[in-house]
């Protein structure tokens, strides 16, 4: 259920009009085809997970990690809005947060996966690559997400955005693994997705009888925060890592002294992810009712106090996306998101509507999912974008789309989609002064191949004259060639700068010397493009 009355204010309109296109990423890939792709990074033997000495055997089983590419082709500005296909706001809000995740977006723009993907059918990584590339290279447009993104999840009703988010992340993680079913457990923790979103919990139990210590390490892709008694994300994190006393019926059975003894259990972050997904537990597991309370969250978050190793410096994260639910239950309401473009401007992504907003508006929401990225990672990717090439000229994607379509269809089955509807792409127009208009006319006047009386050069071939000009009063119906001659004569003052775009209405306003000052109230010619 989409409730427009629940929308929050504080933003100003960014796009004055939306351009709806079909689900085809050709225009986005056209730009990538015209530029050289970054070389694949060599395999790195460095393990970013700082494992303890007792975990050295496990570390040797981990697959070598690939360095995530830094793409110089990622646009700095905001991309497209997403069309709501009916109770799909949860999908749109989640996809926008993933689209503006810098490490994931840059990897997708490199097309590294689709060039080596061996899966006979569509995989989530290939599908997400097409979506992210297309969305980031379609500013001012409204695009329709591929149905393959929610295949097996969407059932035609409102779903939980966090569940869909983790469904997509898990599907991308599985797409990174080999095709065979038997995969080593530790190999799952070295995939591209785990490099971006993954970290490691450290659960430490200390026996208060023999002072023995037992450590358990578990991977994670997101962190759920209990906000029942917390007024801020910082308080929720402090409660999460607060030591827990195990005694009485919950006494710990120590493996060293072989006794049931009181113990202390502490949960900390052993390694923190590049991208941190914090989920505020707002919905009841039983009833689905929402805990509608304001929980403060900062623009910059220091995660060092919650790490197992306290001897290092600050570990600062910056906020780049917020997923919001407006409503009273997980079964209804409306989802939208806020994202931070690489240029630093925040935008509200509400299905097809894209509006610029302030950081004050972003921090005042009843957030459901928070997306943080390490400050060093954000600065590294921002520097990469700032060194990128200059923006393309308007309309360049339309020129090269047809030339690249054949090559795109050979890349991977997931990248194939219906054709773009050319009628829905608007052309840019440029204003011109009278002096600017006269100058090219004088330059072109001496060229013999240019015929100013030839109307075909300035009017589209599918023009139908509804109202004839004022010269028709002196004609007879059996002289069509005379009508055509006068129509050509009336077009002498029109130039290519005033050519009529397909799908618009135009009127011939030029007058010949013979009719100057006469018949001021006669009808002008009205043209319709079919």
Curated annotation (Swiss-Prot):
Region Disordered, residue ranges: 382-416, 490-530
Subcellular location: Nucleus; Endoplasmic reticulum
Record's keyword annotation contains Transport: no
Active site: 89, 334
Region Mediates interaction with SUDS3: start-end pairs: 399-530
Main location: nucleus
GO biological process, one term: negative regulation of GTPase activity
Record's keyword terms, sorted: Apoptosis, Cell cycle, Endoplasmic reticulum, Hydrolase, Nucleus, Protease, Thiol protease, Ubl conjugation pathway
InterPro entries xref list: Papain-like_cys_pep_sf, Peptidase_C19, Peptidase_C19_UCH, USP_CS, USP_dom
Catalytic activity from the UniProt record: Thiol-dependent hydrolysis of ester, thioester, amide, peptide and isopeptide bonds formed by the C-terminal Gly of ubiquitin (a 76-residue protein attached to proteins as an intracellular targeting signal)
CDD domains tied to this protein: Peptidase_C19E
Domain USP, residue spans: 80-375
Known tissue expression: Broadly expressed.
GO cellular component: cytosol; endoplasmic reticulum membrane; nucleus
Bias (Basic residues) ranges: 511-524
GO molecular function: cysteine-type deubiquitinase activity
Self-association state and partner proteins as the record states: Interacts with SUDS3; the interaction is direct.
Family: Belongs to the peptidase C19 family. USP17 subfamily.
Protein name as annotated: Ubiquitin carboxyl-terminal hydrolase 17
Organism the protein comes from: Homo sapiens (Human)
Gene giving rise to this polypeptide: USP17L2
